[in-house]
Amino acid sequence: MSCPAARKGRQQPGFACEECRRRKARCDRVRPKCGFCTENGMQCVIVEKRQQRGPIKGQLNSMQSQLELPAGIPPVLDDFDIQASGLSEHDMSLVAATSVGTSTEASLILPAALDKLELPASSEAAAAGLPGWPEWLDWQDMNNSSLILPELTASTLTDPLSLDSLNGSPPTMVDSSSKIQMTDLIRAELDQLYFDRVHAFCPIIHRRRYFASLAQDNHTTAQLCLQSAMRALAAAMSANSSHLSEQFYSEARSLLDTHSQTPATPRDKIPLEHIQAWLLLSHYELLRIGVHQAMLTAGRAFRLVQMARLCEIDAPGGDLQLSPVASSSSSISTNTDSSESFVDAEEGRRTFWKKWHVFLHADTMQNSLTRLLPIQVSTRLPAPEANFQNNQPTRTSFLADAMAQTGPSTLSPFAECIIMATLHGRCMTHRRLYATEFEAGTRDFCIRQGWLATAVERRVQMLVPSPAVDSDPMLLFTHMLAYRATVHLSITVQQASWRTVDQQVLAAAYQQRAAQAASEIVRLAKAVPYLSPFKTHPFLPDTLACAATFLSTQTATDGGGDDIQHLLRVLGELQDTHSLARDYLQTLKLQVQGNRQDGWY
């Protein structure tokens, strides 16, 4: 029995021409010109690729009714991927319980269920009266982790104050760092990280007292400012927590700005934590943002230090009125011998000297004359770290007495750094003063030049090399700063117009000292990689760049090019954590490249 013949398809293969489609006539689909167009002498236009047909009749109305009904939300939530959304099961239960009742919540479509709804294109939706995608929503950049819906968090659903900010505000496309949910464990880790890395070059916080304040139930605004500033700086000095630094910085900055705008009465006293927070934020900005913003922020701290009169903590007959700075736990009192009062006064001293230290380096980088050096300072130098942290009162020298000291030094690394920074600042002032106002080479110039050279040389000899230099960022920076002062004195001498043979011999001697000092900076720079970039002093790149600039401007010497390349490598290792290193590295590379073209090395 033979099989029946296959039925011929009713529709011929291919597409009908546009003229037959318009006339609703049967097209024979002959190519290149169908029979109807041939008989009527018309142009036969055939479109091979056509857009897909629109929704079937009633589909748009059905979808629109589903969007308007609250009952359409629960099925979407059932299919939503909780793991990919980043929301906990508790948060999702809150969403399901509170998302029924308003049209705004009912129209919230989660990304994981959008493919199932098959929404029409924007033009078709507009024709149907449906709202299209907002302009701020880029579908190609949207994923379950980067799209943050503020309505779908437990904190916003339970906090009535946060609900007001949701009206009319679109979801925010942000990175994960600005929306990290801080836990007590994260804060504890950053607090510990601060004392492990930051405190070494910014020793102004008493460790035991700080952790005791954290255990309190109520914190003042100044304490919250200090906590956020410390954690921001600690996160900036960590690879694992670096993404948290911007969030803590913004929080601290907002708290400080709000606190600064609060009207104060004459009886109010400046919280010491407020000044410390501004100083720490200036260090953060120096590491992350840039020197100009850091100096603007440091200026806020400078003015607060002057208002609090921290330079008069140890003035003769000093009392509470002479130091109107208030700590959160107790007020500074210079007349009692209790250990707590010593810690109060010592924190005030360290805050003042840190401000002094930052000011001197800011003055150096901004190339301006130092005006605060001649002022009378009635605050003693910082006590040794062990005495400070263990509440053991001790009496230290004033700055002027310590600079005149000739015997072995018994001061703390922080105090030694302050003395050397002061000498370095005076060398810079001496250089600029005689370059702008007086003639270099005069008698006054020679006297001051000789005094500074002797003072720096004596201080270098007092800084006996020790194994701690390679592991202490403050000591390492102090040694480099001493050699940098020698380099600046040599540069100052080169600007003088020497007339006698003795003066020219003296200038050559200064040049030789500067070359040796630059070599010592290169030697000390070899310890920076072992110290770790996360513990390196924020102002260290400035000293490295000074040595590299001096070496690059000298004539070719044995190993001079290798020393410069080593300094550039160290700056390259610091550029990820120190903005100064990034800025100087680009400038020095161009300078070195130009010197190579000149055939120096």
Curated annotation (Swiss-Prot):
One of its GO terms (molecular function) is zinc ion binding. One of its GO terms (biological process) is positive regulation of metabolic process. It holds the Pfam family Fungal_trans. InterPro entries: TF_fung, Transcription_factor_dom_fun, Zn2-C6_fun-type_DNA-bd_sf, Zn2Cys6_DnaBD. The keyword DNA-binding applies. Keywords: DNA-binding, Metal-binding, Nucleus, Transcription, Transcription regulation, Zinc. Disruption phenotype: Results in the significant down-regulation of cluster B, whereas it exerts no influence on cluster A. Induction: Expression is induced by the azasperpyranone transcriptional regulator ATEG_07667. It comes from the Eukaryota. Gene3D superfamilies: Zn(2)-C6 fungal-type DNA-binding domain. Residues 17-44 bind DNA. Azasperpyranones display potential anti-cancer activities. Azasperpyranones A, C, D, and F exhibit potent growth-inhibitory activity against the A549, HepG2, HCT-116, and HL-60 cell lines, with IC(50) values of 2.39-14.42 mm, respectively. Moreover, azasperpyranone D significantly inhibits HCT-116 xenograft tumor growth in BALB/c-nu mice. In addition, azasperpyranones A and C can bind with four kinds of therapeutic targets for cancer, eEF2K, FGFR, survivin, and TNF-a. It is found in: Nucleus. PANTHER family: C6 FINGER DOMAIN TRANSCRIPTION FACTOR DBAA-RELATED, ZN(II)2CYS6 TRANSCRIPTION FACTOR (EUROFUNG)-RELATED. This is Transcription factor ATEG_07666. It comes from Aspergillus terreus (strain NIH 2624 / FGSC A1156). The lineage of its organism: Eukaryota, Fungi, Dikarya, Ascomycota, Pezizomycotina.
